[in-house]
Amino acid sequence: MPLNIEDKKAVVAEVSAQVAKAQTIVVAEYRGITVGDLTKLRSTARQQGVYLRVLKNTLARRAVEGTPFASLAEQMTGPLIYGISEDAVSSAKVLNDFAKTNDKLVLRAGSYDGKVLDAAAVKALASIPSRDELIAQLLGVMQAPVSGFARLLAALAAKNAEGAPAEAEAAGA
């Protein structure tokens, strides 16, 4: 059923609001995907904080007008699904991981930091750890020397505690 003009304006406004907050948009062709598979993809995207939407390309072009993603409009042809995320890598990760298990989803393009990315660049972006993963790695690196020092102190304390009763018995005898 076609959308009337008010519905189209509402869709463009909703997508524009998501685009305004986004760091990355990834575009993929979804021709031939079953409803069940698409539902799984939407569920995964929702868990990862990715706004996933199938919409008319003309509405998507209007939504990205005047944004850093406007250059992506040339890539908006055919049946596409749009992954929009505030995190730089999560939309690329979600769609790339799904494309690995489902050959009917084909990554087409993306946009990050005002630059249009081809499918290979989107896959490369998906291989980068997310912000949360990088923070966890940094904390692990920072915490390792402190925890090693704490284990050393605990081992010394345990060794001294074991040796102290033997010395007390020898002194008392």
UniProtKB/Swiss-Prot annotation:
Transmembrane segments: none annotated. Part of the ribosomal stalk of the 50S ribosomal subunit. The N-terminus interacts with L11 and the large rRNA to form the base of the stalk. The C-terminus forms an elongated spine to which L12 dimers bind in a sequential fashion forming a multimeric L10(L12)X complex. The gene is rplJ. Forms part of the ribosomal stalk, playing a central role in the interaction of the ribosome with GTP-bound translation factors. PROSITE patterns: RIBOSOMAL_L10. Belongs to the universal ribosomal protein uL10 family. PANTHER family: 39S RIBOSOMAL PROTEIN L10, MITOCHONDRIAL (PTHR11560). One of its GO terms (cellular component) is large ribosomal subunit. CDD domains: Ribosomal_L10. One of its GO terms (biological process) is translation. It comes from Cupriavidus necator (strain ATCC 17699 / DSM 428 / KCTC 22496 / NCIMB 10442 / H16 / Stanier 337) (Ralstonia eutropha). This is Large ribosomal subunit protein uL10. The keyword Nucleotide-binding does not apply. Keywords: Ribonucleoprotein, Ribosomal protein, RNA-binding, rRNA-binding. One of its GO terms (molecular function) is large ribosomal subunit rRNA binding.
